[in-house]
């Protein structure tokens, strides 16, 4: 991420990706004003579980972010249709939980034809909605399980939206067990 961009991890865990983003951006600061800008609303996160939420706050504080903006709660609990331009960000870095299932109430936040219990696909939809659009589109680096973009049904419908609307740059597939 570049200085002046807003970075989000919607499932930040203990904040590792956000700490690295902050450290990377801090190296770009050359003036007091730039450091102040970095401290104010540049690094954002959400975490559903209480202990990782507290650890993320502490992790960012220990690495120099004076007022971490980590929100407690599940990022998926906001209906996608309510996410507008003001909620969009420049960069999303995340390793969302996958393999689990979300409670039924969460599914109603997603379009009917894309509702699934597979958490990775829900987070992928959220990420697509939270990224800034043209003229300066946002970027994301997301860890997802093998094959999530190669499934059929809901996965195929999400991919049909992803490919024409976003520039899918790279897919790195790791061998099983890595």
State where each predicted segment sits.
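Short, flexible, mixed-charge acidic loops at enzyme active sites
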Residues: 98-108
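Conserved beta-strand signature within the Rossmann-like core of class I S-adenosyl-L-methionine
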Residues: 136-144
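Glycine-rich S-adenosyl-L-methionine
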Residues: 109-132
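Conserved S-adenosyl-L-methionine
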Residues: 1-91, 99-101, 117, 121, 167-176, ...
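Short beta-alpha connecting loops at secondary-structure transitions
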Residues: 40-44, 107-112, 173-174
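A generic alpha-to-beta junction signature in SAM-dependent methyltransferases
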Residues: 1, 131-135
């Amino acid at each position: 991420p570049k200085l002046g961009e807003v970075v989000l991890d919607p499932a930040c865990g203990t904040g590792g990706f956000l700490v690295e983003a902050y450290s990377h951006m801090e190296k770009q600061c050359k003036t007091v004003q730039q450091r102040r800008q970095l401290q104010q609303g540049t690094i954002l996160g959400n975490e559903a579980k209480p202990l990782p939420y507290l650890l993320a706050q502490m992790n960012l504080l220990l690495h120099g972010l004076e007022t971490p903006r980590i929100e407690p709660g599940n990022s998926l609990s906001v209906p996608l249709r309510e996410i507008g331009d003001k909620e969009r960000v420049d960069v999303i870095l995340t390793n969302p939980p996958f393999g689990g299932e979300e409670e039924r109430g969460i599914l109603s936040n997603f379009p009917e034809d894309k509702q699934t219990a597979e958490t990775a696909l829900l987070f992928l939809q959220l990420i697509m909605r939270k990224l800034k659009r043209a003229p300066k589109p946002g970027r994301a680096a997301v860890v997802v399980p093998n094959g999530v973009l190669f499934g059929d049904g809901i996965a195929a419908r999400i991919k049909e939206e992803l490919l024409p609307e976003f520039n899918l740059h790279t897919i790195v597939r790791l061998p099983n067990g890595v």
